[in-house]
Amino acid sequence: MCMSEMTTSQAAELLGVTPRQVARMASSGRIDVARRVGRTLLVDAGSVHRLVRQRRHPGRIWTQRTAWSALSLLSGSDPVWASSAERTRLIHRLRRMAPEELTHLSANRAVVHRFRGDSEATHDLPNYIAVTGSSATRHPLWQRFELTSEPTGVDGYVPASELEPLVDHFHLVPDPAGEIALRTTTFESAFLGGHTPWAAVAVDLTESLDTRESRAGHNELTELLERMRQHDR
């Protein structure tokens, strides 16, 4: 076992949970799977330490509804499902927020499902989902990240009701270590024109295990939050 991997027992000790809970976190995508050795599940140490850092931030994690309200506001869109009072409260809170806190509070924005698939799935799937993270290379604001490497997998959001049809259509196989990440959400209204809100793209990048991608996402969130503070002056 290399230093970039750890057992579920080691991860559980760091997180203060049970190995079974760590396995569930890996299954849901909150922790990345490194590989399996027989029946032993090895998780990515970097993703465990990232989760440890997130848990240091105070505040109860937002519901999907609130998370998408905040991410839409930060992206310059109007969350029509939120009341005027809710939007005002969120704006005031965002103006006092750091990127790390935003990432922590919006952790429930979707449920992550990982799969493996063939080359056809990797090539065509982005046309059926709202791409995000390193897969959002065609977003009109992508150049702001200054990232040049091509994505190796697929990352994107889908309505919860469309997950099963997509899995069947592309013959995807559930795999905790798979390079296809489908994030199911119940807030389709947040995806104007079928696009992921820009702030969500940045948040997803901050959670990347690639240092350059994570830094690019963090820097963009810093800029977006600063712009919101500027509007208050």
Question: Which residues are covered by each model-predicted region?
Answer:
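Phosphate-handling catalytic interfaces
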Residues: 92-233
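Short helix-start
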Residues: 28, 32-55
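Polyanion-binding surface elements
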Residues: 1-25
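A generic structural signal for beta-strand entry/edge sites
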Residues: 3-5, 38-42, 153
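A short, Lys/Arg-enriched interface patch at domain edges and termini
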Residues: 47-83
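Short acidic, hydrophobic short linear motifs in intrinsically disordered regions
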Residues: 4-9, 80-91
